[in-house]
């Protein structure tokens, strides 16, 4: 698939920039971006959690250098929020939506310093239209990013190259 190849390439480009790739550590896009990072000699961290009702994964994917096992889903997200210098959001499901919402909420309320949130493709655009009138409450976030509404916390990009460019 073209999307899979592009996510692998994204991981490779991030590693070439010297970035550590942090993900949920399991399969799908998490594995693809980690595979790409490892192919370029990069470091990967997987923040995992195993207490699903129906366990899907028994271990982190083979491309994870360091696994951090969280005690809860919320701790998993909290660890990623604290460790990341930027967030790249790929198409996904409810887990990705929860991570994105937590990231936006933490920045909106000033619980973490504002960091780049880059949305690869248009997948999440319909979800974020509801934030156009949602004000940013943190004065620090407003001043650091020169924004007033929550939808301005994110940057949409069309492709991997544009994503990497926005991280410079």
Residues covered by each model-derived region:
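Short, glycine/polar-rich helix-capping loops at beta-to-alpha or helix-loop-helix junctions
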Residues: 52-60, 76, 127-128, 133-143
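A charged, well-structured terminal subsegment
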Residues: 79-86, 141-168
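Glycine-rich, charge-decorated loop segments at or immediately adjacent to ligand/cofactor-binding or catalytic sites
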Residues: 27-36, 124-136
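Short, hinge-like loop/turn segments at secondary-structure boundaries
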Residues: 38-42, 61-66, 133-138
């Amino acid at each position: 698939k073209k999307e899979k190849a592009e996510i692998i390439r994204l991981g490779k480009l991030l590693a070439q920039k010297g970035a550590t790739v942090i993900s949920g550590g399991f399969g799908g896009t998490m594995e693809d971006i980690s595979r790409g990072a490892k192919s370029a000699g990069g470091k990967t961290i997987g923040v995992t959690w195993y207490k699903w009702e129906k366990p899907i994964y028994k271990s982190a994917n083979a491309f994870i250098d360091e696994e951090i096992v969280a005690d809860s889903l919320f701790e998993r997200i909290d660890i990623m929020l604290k460790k990341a210098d930027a967030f790249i959001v790929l198409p996904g499901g409810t887990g990705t939506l929860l991570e994105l919402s937590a990231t936006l909420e933490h920045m909106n309320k000033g619980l973490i310093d504002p960091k780049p949130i880059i949305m690869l493709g248009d997948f999440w655009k319909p979800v974020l239209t509801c934030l156009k009138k949602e004000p940013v409450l943190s004065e620090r976030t407003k001043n650091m990013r020169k924004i007033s509404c929550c939808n301005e916390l994110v940057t949409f990009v069309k492709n991997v190259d544009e994503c990497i460019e926005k991280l410079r």
